[in-house]
């Protein structure tokens, strides 16, 4: 489970994914208001507090605002401006 949901601007669209442990992992079930669940394979050593990336790169894997825009049927500016202030932003 990660603490981001549709109240944070992460849309309730089938096909959403996040990066955890350098892998693109699918969101399972429905994105809730303040959280969503991620399918993590047993062989991936993930622990509470590990970083989950919504937009960006992690160990060679990436999800761009353009990727989400295509999935959500919108433009990349709407994706980035729609994310709430609760979503931590790290610019590298």
Give a label for each model feature.
Residues 1-92:
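Active-site anion/phosphate-binding pocket segments in diverse small-molecule metabolic enzymes
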């Amino acid at each position: 489970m990660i603490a981001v949901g549709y109240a944070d601007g992460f849309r309730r669209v089938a096909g959403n994914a996040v990066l955890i442990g350098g892998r693109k992992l699918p969101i399972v079930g429905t994105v809730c208001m303040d959280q969503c669940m991620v399918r993590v394979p047993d062989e991936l050593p993930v622990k509470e507090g590990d970083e989950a990336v919504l937009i960006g790169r992690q160990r060679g894997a990436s999800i761009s605002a353009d990727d989400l825009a295509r999935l959500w049927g919108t433009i990349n500016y709407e994706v980035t401006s729609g994310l709430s202030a609760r979503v931590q932003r790290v610019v590298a």
